[in-house]
């Protein structure tokens, strides 16, 4: 959530920043007008309450002195009626201010391409050599089905489209990949967490999914209370410290977790209808950081490095891009996407998004620390995929496919596959 005080102090700057995220200036004007009226009503209410207290004291004295206090009692009733009316207006103003404020995205960082067009995202650099084949490279879904390690047809029978069965060597490969990821993150100082896969509405609000993106999630009820299947481990990891004060000496705090992610993919009809790229349920290893504000840009680079390191050890070519302002996530001030090369598609596809959310999530979730002066400050939060497991499997199948239909297993994964170096039809 944005700092309303900052918007109040720098309204034109705020409008310019948010215009790059498709927010109209009129919305900011409305917010500020409501905020101004709210502050006026607050002052009026406090003045009337003070007056009521004074009159109440006068009435008590007059009654002790057996004086007639009818006029004062009448005046106090009138003041009470005015207070009730102002309290009602104040509640309505609070609701309207909150409604607008919680739906405003984070301010984009200064070095982000300021554009409403995702095509204006900026490529920063590339890594690795794209594989060359003396045959037409196949799509990962064709490879997986022919090897008998991916079964989309039976998954559709059981659950519908955008689901898959991993079988045999495919299941072992998926498990090998995420165990490799977790081990590497542990070496880099991340604490592994196994979090809840169902979270309450306050948690979804804290990380910015609610109220704006309720249509993109799956929700159930438990004893009448709604619980949402997590769209990413970012939600339970960030909310670990919701309404909490972190010891400054512990910062930065680094968490990692493997969880399934559940997404309705609303608005994705017709996109990536085959394969592992866009699923309703998929495994993902997430990285989350909590740090002091002055450290967050350095921590973003560390986050990107930790995601890149996995791709480099897997030998998968990729590039890093800085997303245009309106293509970044709702909570992000800056997002760098890592996109892995997919030979059959002849294009890069996202495999990790690394974001600095500055104090946006911490303000919503009330996550703070005490600075050197003992003053409470909001931490900065960062998150990144490290990595999306299904997309990693897809990229391994495509980049390591062989002419005979088999798939070579990346060297770093072989120990996690009990020494198996390739997946063949017989596996």
UniProtKB/Swiss-Prot annotation:
Statement: the UniProt record of this protein carries the keyword rRNA processing: no
What does the entry give for GO biological process?
selenocysteine biosynthetic process; seryl-tRNA aminoacylation
Q: Where does ATP bind?
A: 263-265, 350-353
Q: In which pathway does it act?
A: Aminoacyl-tRNA biosynthesis; selenocysteinyl-tRNA(Sec) biosynthesis; L-seryl-tRNA(Sec) from L-serine and tRNA(Sec): step 1/1
- Primary location class: cytoplasm
Alphabetical list of Gene3D superfamilies matching this protein: Bira Bifunctional Protein, Domain 2, Serine-tRNA synthetase, tRNA binding domain
Reactions catalysed = tRNA(Ser) + L-serine + ATP = L-seryl-tRNA(Ser) + AMP + diphosphate + H(+); tRNA(Sec) + L-serine + ATP = L-seryl-tRNA(Sec) + AMP + diphosphate + H(+)
Q: Which keywords describe this protein according to UniProt?
A: Aminoacyl-tRNA synthetase, ATP-binding, Cytoplasm, Ligase, Nucleotide-binding, Protein biosynthesis
Q: Which PANTHER family match?
A: SERINE--TRNA LIGASE (PTHR43697:SF1), SERYL-TRNA SYNTHETASE (PTHR43697)
Name the family.
Belongs to the class-II aminoacyl-tRNA synthetase family. Type-1 seryl-tRNA synthetase subfamily.
Record remark on domains: Consists of two distinct domains, a catalytic core and a N-terminal extension that is involved in tRNA binding.
This molecule's function is given as: Catalyzes the attachment of serine to tRNA(Ser). Is also able to aminoacylate tRNA(Sec) with serine, to form the misacylated tRNA L-seryl-tRNA(Sec), which will be further converted into selenocysteinyl-tRNA(Sec).
The subunit field of the Swiss-Prot or TrEMBL record says: Homodimer. The tRNA molecule binds across the dimer.
Q: What name goes with this protein? A: Serine--tRNA ligase
